[in-house]
Protein backbone atom coordinates (compact mmCIF):
# COMPACT_ATOMS: atom_id res chain seq x y z
CA UNK A 1 0.00 0.00 0.00
CA UNK A 2 1.49 3.36 -0.96
CA UNK A 3 1.94 6.03 1.69
CA UNK A 4 -1.10 8.24 2.28
CA UNK A 5 -0.75 11.30 0.05
CA UNK A 6 -0.83 14.76 1.55
CA UNK A 7 -3.84 16.96 0.84
CA UNK A 8 -3.48 19.25 -2.16
CA UNK A 9 -6.90 20.91 -1.97
CA UNK A 10 -5.36 24.39 -1.70
CA UNK A 11 -3.11 23.99 -4.74
CA UNK A 12 -4.30 25.22 -8.12
CA UNK A 13 -1.54 24.22 -10.53
CA UNK A 14 -2.57 21.70 -13.19
CA UNK A 15 -6.19 22.05 -12.14
CA UNK A 16 -9.01 23.34 -14.21
CA UNK A 17 -12.69 23.39 -14.95
CA UNK A 18 -14.07 23.04 -18.44
CA UNK A 19 -17.69 23.41 -19.53
CA UNK A 20 -18.96 20.97 -22.15
CA UNK A 21 -20.48 22.11 -25.41
CA UNK A 22 -24.06 21.26 -26.46
CA UNK A 23 -22.96 17.74 -27.42
CA UNK A 24 -21.28 17.14 -24.04
CA UNK A 25 -17.76 17.44 -25.44
CA UNK A 26 -14.95 19.13 -23.57
CA UNK A 27 -11.41 19.91 -24.73
CA UNK A 28 -8.41 21.07 -22.76
CA UNK A 29 -4.67 21.38 -23.21
CA UNK A 30 -2.31 20.09 -20.53
CA UNK A 31 1.05 18.46 -20.02
CA UNK A 32 1.58 14.73 -19.58
CA UNK A 33 1.12 14.03 -15.87
CA UNK A 34 3.96 12.82 -13.70
CA UNK A 35 3.54 10.07 -11.12
CA UNK A 36 3.75 9.61 -7.38
CA UNK A 37 4.48 6.59 -5.15
CA UNK A 38 2.25 3.62 -5.88
CA UNK A 39 0.45 5.18 -8.84
CA UNK A 40 0.76 5.17 -12.60
CA UNK A 41 0.52 8.41 -14.62
CA UNK A 42 -3.12 9.52 -14.68
CA UNK A 43 -5.43 12.54 -14.71
CA UNK A 44 -8.27 12.89 -12.23
CA UNK A 45 -11.63 13.88 -13.63
CA UNK A 46 -14.89 14.79 -12.01
CA UNK A 47 -18.19 15.60 -13.71
CA UNK A 48 -20.35 18.20 -11.97
CA UNK A 49 -23.94 18.82 -13.05
CA UNK A 50 -26.15 21.82 -12.30
CA UNK A 51 -23.64 24.33 -10.97
CA UNK A 52 -21.61 27.17 -12.39
CA UNK A 53 -18.58 29.40 -12.03
CA UNK A 54 -18.63 32.04 -9.30
CA UNK A 55 -16.31 34.77 -8.11
CA UNK A 56 -13.50 33.54 -5.84
CA UNK A 57 -14.31 33.29 -2.14
CA UNK A 58 -12.27 35.22 0.43
CA UNK A 59 -10.10 32.15 1.14
CA UNK A 60 -9.14 32.10 -2.55
CA UNK A 61 -7.87 35.70 -2.50
CA UNK A 62 -4.32 34.44 -3.03
CA UNK A 63 -5.35 33.24 -6.47
CA UNK A 64 -6.80 36.31 -8.21
CA UNK A 65 -8.85 35.59 -11.29
CA UNK A 66 -9.41 31.95 -10.36
CA UNK A 67 -13.13 31.25 -10.65
CA UNK A 68 -14.69 28.64 -8.38
CA UNK A 69 -17.30 26.13 -9.54
CA UNK A 70 -20.19 25.96 -7.08
CA UNK A 71 -23.57 24.31 -6.77
CA UNK A 72 -24.97 21.25 -8.44
CA UNK A 73 -23.77 17.76 -7.66
CA UNK A 74 -21.02 15.32 -8.65
CA UNK A 75 -22.31 12.80 -11.21
CA UNK A 76 -19.00 11.02 -11.92
CA UNK A 77 -15.52 10.74 -10.45
CA UNK A 78 -12.86 8.87 -12.38
CA UNK A 79 -9.34 8.80 -13.72
CA UNK A 80 -7.98 8.97 -17.25
CA UNK A 81 -5.10 6.57 -17.94
CA UNK A 82 -2.57 6.35 -20.76
CA UNK A 83 -1.26 3.37 -22.75
CA UNK A 84 1.73 1.82 -20.96
CA UNK A 85 4.07 2.16 -23.94
CA UNK A 86 3.41 5.90 -24.20
CA UNK A 87 3.87 6.44 -20.45
CA UNK A 88 7.22 4.60 -20.58
CA UNK A 89 8.31 6.69 -23.58
CA UNK A 90 7.39 9.98 -21.91
CA UNK A 91 8.96 8.96 -18.58
CA UNK A 92 12.26 8.33 -20.41
CA UNK A 93 12.40 11.98 -21.53
CA UNK A 94 13.43 15.08 -19.59
CA UNK A 95 12.15 16.28 -17.12
CA UNK A 96 10.28 13.06 -16.28
CA UNK A 97 13.48 10.98 -16.39
CA UNK A 98 14.88 12.91 -13.41
CA UNK A 99 12.10 11.59 -11.15
CA UNK A 100 13.59 9.41 -8.39
CA UNK A 101 10.29 7.80 -7.34
CA UNK A 102 9.68 4.41 -8.98
CA UNK A 103 6.88 4.57 -11.52
CA UNK A 104 4.12 2.01 -11.01
CA UNK A 105 3.17 0.16 -14.20
CA UNK A 106 -0.40 0.32 -15.46
CA UNK A 107 -1.07 -3.35 -14.63
CA UNK A 108 0.19 -2.78 -11.06
CA UNK A 109 -1.92 0.29 -10.32
CA UNK A 110 -4.55 -0.33 -7.62
CA UNK A 111 -7.11 2.11 -9.01
CA UNK A 112 -6.69 0.90 -12.59
CA UNK A 113 -7.17 -2.72 -11.48
CA UNK A 114 -9.89 -2.10 -8.90
CA UNK A 115 -12.11 0.47 -10.57
CA UNK A 116 -12.49 -0.49 -14.23
CA UNK A 117 -9.41 1.31 -15.48
CA UNK A 118 -9.29 -0.61 -18.75
CA UNK A 119 -12.33 1.41 -19.88
CA UNK A 120 -10.55 4.66 -19.01
CA UNK A 121 -7.40 4.38 -21.15
CA UNK A 122 -7.26 7.30 -23.56
CA UNK A 123 -6.65 6.74 -27.25
CA UNK A 124 -3.52 8.73 -28.07
CA UNK A 125 -2.69 10.11 -31.50
CA UNK A 126 0.68 11.84 -32.05
CA UNK A 127 0.35 15.48 -33.11
CA UNK A 128 3.01 14.91 -35.78
CA UNK A 129 4.20 11.68 -37.35
CA UNK A 130 7.87 12.66 -37.19
CA UNK A 131 8.39 13.91 -33.64
CA UNK A 132 6.58 12.17 -30.76
CA UNK A 133 7.83 14.85 -28.36
CA UNK A 134 5.53 17.34 -30.16
CA UNK A 135 2.73 15.83 -28.13
CA UNK A 136 -0.40 13.77 -28.44
CA UNK A 137 -4.13 14.26 -28.75
CA UNK A 138 -5.91 12.09 -26.19
CA UNK A 139 -9.47 10.96 -26.79
CA UNK A 140 -11.74 9.30 -24.25
CA UNK A 141 -15.49 8.79 -24.31
CA UNK A 142 -17.05 8.91 -20.84
CA UNK A 143 -20.74 8.07 -20.50
CA UNK A 144 -22.22 9.81 -17.44
CA UNK A 145 -25.68 9.58 -15.90
CA UNK A 146 -26.39 13.23 -15.01
CA UNK A 147 -28.73 12.13 -12.20
CA UNK A 148 -26.12 9.86 -10.55
CA UNK A 149 -24.73 10.78 -7.13
CA UNK A 150 -21.92 8.25 -6.59
CA UNK A 151 -20.19 7.72 -3.26
CA UNK A 152 -16.62 8.95 -2.85
CA UNK A 153 -14.14 6.10 -3.38
CA UNK A 154 -10.50 6.14 -2.30
CA UNK A 155 -8.55 8.01 0.31
CA UNK A 156 -8.68 11.61 1.29
CA UNK A 157 -11.52 13.99 0.91
CA UNK A 158 -12.67 15.62 -2.30
CA UNK A 159 -11.22 19.01 -3.07
CA UNK A 160 -13.12 21.90 -4.55
CA UNK A 161 -12.78 22.15 -8.30
CA UNK A 162 -11.28 25.45 -9.41
Where are these regions (language model features)?
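Beta-strand-dominated extracellular/periplasmic modules and repeats
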Residues: 1-107, 145-151, 155-158
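Short conserved active-site loop signatures built around small residues
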Residues: 111
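C-terminal, well-folded lobe of enzymatic/effector domains
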Residues: 117, 122-162
Amino acid sequence: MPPKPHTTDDLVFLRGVQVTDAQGIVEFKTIFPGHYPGRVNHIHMKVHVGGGATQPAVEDAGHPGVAVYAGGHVAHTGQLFFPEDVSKFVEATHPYSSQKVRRTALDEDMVFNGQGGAESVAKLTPVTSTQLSDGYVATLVVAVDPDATPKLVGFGRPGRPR
